[in-house]
Amino acid sequence: MTYSFVVCENLPGLTIVAEERLDALADILGQYTVVGKTRGSDLAGSQYRSPFAVEVRRPVILSNHVTVESGTGLVHCAPAHGAEDYNAFLALDPGSFRSGLLCHVDGEGKFTDDIAEVVGDSAAKELVGQDIMEAGSRTVTKLLKAVGALVKVQRIRHRYPYDWKTGEPVITL
């Protein structure tokens, strides 16, 4: 996959988008100029800053479940909460399973204190105890907007497991 570095009139800094997604995202990006391109493999190992806790740096990793079929061609990774993310995490460092796997959701589907390791202490205060599928999701959206990291809110239909008896979502822990 090839990625474009774009400067958008309505967004600060550089935005990275899969080249094949630029046309599909034109309405969201607004007027933009491509200022560079790179292969996805060249991004591997580089780091990005969390929009919540800028002192936290995370590695860019590659995974074959990221495609140009939808979105930007970039996704976040939550290895404690899904098979694709878990496999990408293990491929990054097979020995890191015990020491690096962070689960910030409890058995009731609510954010725990461990969320601070992902979003920082300030944002964690607003998230701890919130249901991840309801109030927690709304709070994450609010927090992203507050730090200028939210470009668009849109409902996306995801394949997601539901318990056949209760109709409730199944959260992988």
Where are these regions (language model features)?
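Residue patterns forming the tRNA-binding/recognition surfaces of aminoacyl-tRNA synthetases
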Residues: 1-5, 45, 55-57, 70-173
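Protease-associated
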Residues: 2-74, 83-87
